Regions:
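Positively charged n-region of N-terminal signal peptides that target proteins for export
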Residues: 1-4
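Secreted/periplasmic proteins
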Residues: 17-124
Length: 124
């Protein structure tokens, strides 16, 4: 019974962490920030200038490399929240997959950009 449990647990873990991302596909990302104290879906205190991001399904703690396709700048973020949930008709051919904390966004784009085209890669 113990072996069966470990086998199933290992299989599920591998499936969760082996989510495929098409590294050639272009997605969109934006940033979010708050003026008051908020907590992320993972229970961490949100830091406007942290290197964190929200994703709908990736496990909390996953490291993701995000690259701005317009300027080639990259940042590595940790998933600690859920989202994005905003619909983007202006980017109907792209899928918004990440909301970056403002600090992470500013590493790869100006705040005035608002929404940027990205590629991303799951690191761990």
């Amino acid at each position: 019974m113990k072996k069966l449990f470990l086998t199933i647990f290992s299989f599920i873990t591998v499936m969760l962490y082996s989510q495929k991302v098409d590294s050639n596909k272009i997605y969109t990302a934006s940033y979010y920030a708050y003026n008051t104290t908020r907590y992320t879906a993972s229970g961490q205190k949100f830091n406007n200038y942290g290197l964190t991001a929200a994703h709908k399904t990736l496990p909390f703690g996953t490291k993701v490399k995000v690259t701005n396709v317009n300027n080639g700048k990259s940042v590595v973020v940790t998933i600690n929240d859920r989202g994005p949930f905003k619909k983007t008709p202006d980017f109907k051919y792209y899928s918004r997959v990440l909301d970056l904390a403002k600090g992470a966004f500013l590493k790869i784009a100006s705040a005035g950009a608002g929404v940027i085209k990205i590629k991303y890669e799951i690191l761990e």
